[in-house]
Amino acid sequence: MAAVTGWDRVEVKKRLSEEHWDPWMAWMNAYFPLSSSDRKDWDSKTWVRNLHELRLRDLLLFTLGDLRGKKVLDVGCGGGIYLGIVSKMGAAHIAGQDLSQKDIALARNRFQREGVPADIKLGNATELQFETESFDVVFSADFFEHVTLEQKRKIVSEVYRVLKPGGLFAIKTPNLSYLKFTTALRRVAAAAKLKSPLNIHVPHTRDNPDSEHCGLTTHAELEKLLFDRMFHDPEVIYPPLRWKGAAGFAARFLKGRKRFAEQIILTTRKPLFYGFYPGHD
């Protein structure tokens, strides 16, 4: 597609929000057609942050492996942006479940418009509306931070149920340990500038009426949930840190330590021997 020049920022945003089913799709379709000179006019921090998030999303999808011929479920699928990529990765069957009627409608309309068969269900993830042992791969991205610990237990049990023995389960969610660490650094920096550190807190956890991130978790808590449900020991993937300067130099030595991973990205598998045993539940 040729680069777009001489654009009006407000008009582009309005047009894209009307044409595209998901704000992230609108953002990507706004970014990539623009000329390099136009991109420079936009807030560089916003672009760096958003492109970094796309890299993290890629990293999760890379962990799913070869999806050709496989049945894949997205738990907490939202508008289906991940499933759209999964379908392009060759999955034989894609499915998703979410509690938001608006997001489910967006996903269904999108896949219908693109002619992609998709089994999209409306419902709570604590009760997945799919047959036992029906999926090769299940993943959940940017969802676990929105549910309580007790809900996570039920969701993990349901994922275990719908996965085939040996099936893969992948999770991506913000790392509470990292958020606490960086919040502490921001408070110290604020105090050094004679500003109140009390106004700085972990995002989406304070003064937020909908408690958007009520379920932020750590590697240890999440790994224990999986272990308690007899999943295999998780494989942890450490995403790259986007710090610059002295912090970026230090990040080279911090990579591989769970506390300093911005996101929790891990995979685990339903066991084979125990999974095939008829009395495992």
Report each predicted region and the residues it spans:
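S-adenosyl-L-methionine-dependent methyltransferase catalytic module, highlighting the catalytic core
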Residues: 6-7, 15-35, 148-162, 168-281
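Conserved N-terminal segment of class I S-adenosyl-L-methionine
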Residues: 1-131, 137-141, 156, 239-241, ...
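Short catalytic micro-motifs in class I SAM-dependent methyltransferases
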Residues: 142-146
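Secondary-structure boundary/capping positions in well-ordered alpha/beta enzyme cores
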Residues: 67, 93, 114, 150, ...
